[in-house]
């Protein structure tokens, strides 16, 4: 890939159709990632590679986490993730129970940057970042606060004084109604009210691409199982050993599958051969009788 989205946005060379295509591809990629039970946790323009055809690839999965094998009681996340400007409210507020909806907030921040050419929430600290977010989303109600699942939420929100909520239309005067609708659905303080990736792909903003390339939108057949605990910090040597052990285990599993397949093929081949031989043995006498019968008829016919 030639460059990244951060550089392209700063260059101000993207046409509206390019922005739509970039957003569609981003959602399409996240559809697969989230279906695998993976949360990227560090989505931002500099982690989206792009070429001259406006084709993108998501990179840097260094902070990605698996959430499939964890139970409801597990503390699944640390709050130190992602560049601050693209962090979801639940991450900023120290929640340890957030999910793939945190990625969707980051998508909203990226979308806003595509539309306006500059970051939406360039906070200088966690509190300042939260203040900038609430200026757009408005102060959360009790339901929204409970959805964050963090004891810090109530106190931090109460310490922020919002003079006047900013309207998206005012912030994005050139944006269309459809663009503002998608942006508003992505930038919901409450993660339960935030649009998910499947819903976003159905949104009118990317509808044309979604209809055209629907067959290429794939989901992971089954969630990715991580055999190394995400909640344990290992040394480099330990990581190497665990990865090596996992590779050996997978290699043995693949060999076993191949052996089973070969056994089935051999069994089916032998069965087929026996079937043909049995049929041939049964049919040969009938063919001989027919020939003799023809000879007899021919003889008396003279």
Language-model features and meaning:
Residues 34-51:
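Catalytic-loop of the protein kinase fold
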Residues 22-23:
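Activation segment signature within eukaryotic-like protein kinase domains
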Residues 76-91:
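Conserved activation segment of eukaryotic-like protein kinases, specifically the C-terminal portion
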Residues 140-184:
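C-terminal lobe substrate-recognition/regulatory segment of protein kinase catalytic domains
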Residues 1-10:
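Structural motif in protein kinase domains
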